[in-house]
Amino acid sequence: MSAHTTAEQSPKRRRIHLDNDSKMHFSSILEDGTSKSQEALLPPRRARGYQLEMLSESLRQNIIVAMDTGSGKTEIAILRIQRELERCPAHKFVWFMAPTVALVEQQHSAISKQLPAFQTRLLTGAANVSHWSTKKIWDDILLNIRIVISTPQVLLDALSNGFVDLHTISLLVFDEAHHCVRDAPANRIMRDFYHYHRQEEGTDGLPHILGLTASPTTRARQTDLEVLEINLNAVCVTPKMHREEMMQFVHMPEYRSIEYQPDVQNFSSIVEKLSVIINELDIENDPFVKFMRRRNDLKSRQRLLDALENKKTPCLDQLKRCLRRSRVIHRELGPWASERFLTRCIMGLKSKQTNASGPQWADWDREDNSYMLNVLSQVVSSTEMGVQNPPDELSRKVHKLIDFLVLEHVNGSIGIVFAEERTIVIMLAQLLSLHPRTKHIKTTAFLGSSASVSRKSDITELHNPIDQSTAIDDLRTGKKDLIIATAVLEEGIDVPICDLVICFDLPKDLRSFIQRRGRARKKGSKFALFLHSEDRATSSELHLMEKTMKQLYLENKRALEHIQYLENVEEEGYDGFRVASTGALLTLSNARNHLSHFCGTLSAEFIATDPEFVLEGDDTTGFSAKVILPSFLDPKLREFRGILLWKTEKMAKRDASFQAYVALYEAGLVNDYLMPAHHHIDDEDGLEQVEKRPSFAKALGSLNPWAAIAKKWREAKHFYQNLIEISAGAQAFPPMVMVLPVELPCDISFRLFWNEHSTLLVSVKRGGQDFAADLIRLAADTTSILLSSLFSQKMVPGSLDFSWLFLPQMESIPSAIREWCDSVTGTISLHDIRDCDMAGFENPGLVRPMDNTARPCTFEKLVWRKYVPAETSDGASLSEQVTYDREVPHIEGRVWPKRTDFLHRLEPSNTSKAHHTAKCFYPANNCSVDRLPVEYSQFALFIPCLIHSIENYFIANELAQTILHPVGFSNLSLVLTAISSSAAREASNYQRLEFLGDSLLKLHTSIQLAADHPLWPEGRLTMRKGNIVSNGYLANAALQTGLDKFILTKPFTGAKWRPSYNTDHINTGDMTEPTREMSTKVLADVVEALIGAANIDGGENKILNCLKIFIPDIKWSPLNECVNILHHQEDSFSDENNNMLSEIEGLVGYTFKKKPLLLAAVTHPSSKGSGHSYQRLEFVGDSILDIIVVQELFESPRCFHHFDMHLMRTALVNADFLAFLCMNAYREEDRGEAVENSKRRVTVAMTKRRAYLWGFMKHSASWDIVNAQQRAAKQYEKLHEEIDEKLRSSKTYPWTLLCRLDAAKFFSDIVESILGAIFIDSQGSMPACRIFLERIGLIPYLKRVLSEDLDLMHPKERLGLLAGTLSVKYETKRTQGVEPQRWECAARVGDEEVVRVDCRVSRVDAETTAAEAAVAILKTRKLQSEASNKVAECD
């Protein structure tokens, strides 16, 4: 048996029995006459439960969907087409048929926009399908086509000629299926081909059938419905209407009848003149007769005889048709309209004559045109044609219409006037647009589309095809508010809800009557019919229609009253559900409200969140309900059924809601207070919205490691000596020893900056525990000597209780140390130096002026020079002594720096004398020189820096050995960097590590949460992750663990440095101060920096240990374990077959082992089905993308500054950039296009069609999504070449162009969800993820960012920098009265409006464009100002 059960074989037929139920069915049509256009005009609507019910039924068997106009039949068809194409072989396709060209064009537009991944083909007469005369042409035209949209006649002809095989069609869709009767083309397709094959071969291989209709028959007879079902081999089904929906008030129009008296049939002189001229025409002058007389063949002679006998030629036919229509117009509209009609016919002929010079015009075409123009020009003179008189002589019927419109068509009204004749439609529209009383009404005309050759050449066809193509859109957008139309607008065509529908000509039957009335749905709407007072037959028919309609209304009203009565029946429910810990109670009464609230808190763009109910049963058996929850919930938590049968639908829905909410509670999505867990975070959870944190927190004072060391001095029996070496290129310093009672944490090295040009490298190497206790006192003496050389005023006199001891590297015996101390103690006076005798000064110490008027200096040499006030080489005076003419001995040397901070580079702008080491000259007789060699004094000068650096390592080590002990850091420098804030001005700070750690934290948190909570929706995962990685939460973790006391925030300056004594530390304790104010951001940053440091020090294991310390709320697991869990979770994904996936795999460059992962990755959360959507995968992919980019930036050999890395990451992972990459990803496929040459021979030219990645996204046939796709695609077509060029070669990032795409979030979501799917399917393979990113263009641009110096700063950020201290404001607003919606923005800096931009596609576009323009202006001003200053300086 085939997949689609036949009508006769169906075990669950839900037939509409018109003899019993037809009145209710038709009444619902009368009540709800919304057109298909409401999907675009009303708020966005997802696939409703009844639409999914119809979809499911269509997948099971052939059906005719009978649903009210405006209830979403087209969406059902689109969902069905998508499902069919996903499961059918690639060589098969879908054929969609609609009865009119206008409807075909409309449905082609809808389907191609809704299903952009599939090639569609519109086939109408305009494509000259009748000239496609070979099968090869058809095969080429249908190559790679998956959906064909045409009228039934096109398919019938193709099947009849054998150009198309019915077995290659997988699904036939009949829109307005009630036309499939008798000898209609749709029925001939079924009768001559479908049923023929069915009888011969069975249904195997035949297409599935889907019919769509709002009115199954035009007459209310059961037999007619049975015939329709037989014709389409389908069952007519309709979804069950909920009482709740039926009880909602629907505005029914007020019926009005407009009676008019027909005009006396006295035609105007012009019409009569045309009649006379046509009757008096000499047929021998007719172009056709002349042409045939010139031919001698038998066929031509016969055609000539027929023309002469019947007086029938092409020109005569058109002229007579023109006469007939002018008379109809005269009768219906009046003399003015008929005369204006003839004038327009003449103008049309003149226009054709002007344009008839091309090769496509045959000679007889020109002759016919000239002949008819000559005839008609005798009727209306050129003078009369040039006069544009306002409508004056009008029919009584038109006067009645104008009176009615003036009264009823008020401001804001939208109306339709139905007329039968095409020429009446055109002329009535022109008449109303020109009449003084109605010209304020914005009137247009709509005839539908027709590609008939006869109509193309008909001189009476006055409509403009361009106007026809925009008429409906103009009505939707408000450019027009009244449309005059033929019956083509009765059904199918999307038009807005109207409040005024007028039948200028009466409907032909009940169905037409119902369809027209259905267009009037607004509150207070009017439905008016023009009645000919003398036409009794018409009046009788209309009376029957009115009677039928009133009867339907009355019965519907009674039914609604009965339903309301039934729903008010009180029923006793079952016991509620009580939470023991809180006492919260869930009952049948409050369950539905709870459920609605829960769903509402998970709102997202393009997703309707209200629960849907599907009812089963009836008044006899009782009702049960199924509730369908939004698709962002896991499929296991998406559908729930009530457990009992109820008398009322109300209680059935409450029952289903109760069961659903209990299940949500048990799944952990509802907390103990019966509130959504994702929306109401419990205080005791520790994850409250800590982003509402203060900027600063009270933190512990900085740790003082010397306090613990001071205690060790009192207790230690053995001491550690550590070697200190200082080098500066060729210059060598004597090695020194540092003695401590504890072991150094590690070898230490750092740099010292002696002056602007000289940098020293300090190395401290740990030594053994081999310094004798009896040498401690001597080491204290050496320390005192060293410190006294420079810090005597800061020392405690007589105290040797230092926290650390220093001495030169020498033999560790008392005599050697004493000898050294004796040799370096004291000074030598230079007062008596003569003849530059340098004996005894082989290794001199610092030279000091005896009057202390100047800083010490080094001793380089003794020189003779005139006695002048001592000065340095830069001219700084060092004394005020009198100048002598004779030369005296001077000490030449370098000034000793006054500063003690050598850990920081000297800035070029710093001119403080404390930094100078310039050359100087001191009079020798006023100086003394230290016995302590200058190298030791220089070492003493470095002691503050040395102590500070060692102190930091002791702090870092204490942290590593206590709080961070589980991590097991091996590189203490990483810990030190991680706890060093930028304010501390250490050699390295945490910012780069924090940048890496932030990404690692998000990665592990995202993957862990996704693995631990398979039922959590993306919204809750995101909120939970956001809380965990928030600065507030991490700052709290730092305070809770005591990390705060280890954080370095105070910069070293050395300005107030003094030697450290053990006694002081014992008295003050292990804190430098009790508490301090610390930025909570710094606290959080240090936690992230430690995570980054752990990664560098030991990879994932150390990261996990670090996470366990600071975030113990989560049970952390290795990434591979989490990925395995996620990989196995895929087993619960939908396993439905989808042939589309291989195309996506080719596009993304990865073949999935588990195909449902890819299907989920391209499924929008609005999509209805049994599978997952992309939201959770996007949640995972976001963190994968971030870590790939961050690691590349962090590991770059260029060692970027953290600020630059932030700019780079933002440029590479922002939503606009990802959206562009998504829109720029495509695969090409062949497409054939018919080409007709001048001889009307048809060939097929092969072209390429791009299938874009975004087009494969599955969704719920949402017009909001489609419109967003189309807007962005339109912008992409305008901008993509420029954006591509900017990304390839520009030095500036195209922020403005990217935001101008106005791309919805789902474009970037697709990139991240596919990345997440690849990561899980490959079980954590980053190379596989990189291949995808390489393919879509992200990695190539990342390489540019890494290798080139690009300006990546956002214009708004750049403007803020240029503004300096001035404020920057953006005054943004919508541009009024512009369609489509546009924005304008003024950028203000301080009080000045720098620039104003308009006509932008979004608020973001407006502000970004304004910022970019303002930046350009301010930069120009700056350059001009600098140029002016230079000119001024030159002057």
Curated annotation (Swiss-Prot):
GO terms for biological process: defense response to virus; regulation of defense response to virus; siRNA processing. Its cofactor is Mg(2+); Mn(2+). Its EC number is 3.1.26.-, 3.6.4.-. Residues 956-1099, 1141-1323 form the RNase III domain. A motif (DEAH box) lies at residues 175-178. Residues 54-234 form the Helicase ATP-binding domain. InterPro entries: DEAD/DEAH_box_helicase_dom, Dicer_dimer_sf, Dicer_dimerisation_dom, Helicase_ATP-bd, Helicase_C-like, P-loop_NTPase, RNase_III_dom, RNase_III_sf. Keywords: Antiviral defense, Antiviral protein, ATP-binding, Helicase, Hydrolase, Magnesium, Manganese, Metal-binding, Nucleotide-binding, Repeat, RNA-binding. It comes from the Eukaryota. Dicer-like endonuclease involved in cleaving double-stranded RNA in the RNA interference (RNAi) pathway. Produces 21 to 25 bp dsRNAs (siRNAs) which target the selective destruction of homologous RNAs leading to sequence-specific suppression of gene expression, called post-transcriptional gene silencing (PTGS). Part of a broad host defense response against viral infection and transposons. This is Dicer-like protein 2. It comes from Coccidioides immitis (strain RS).
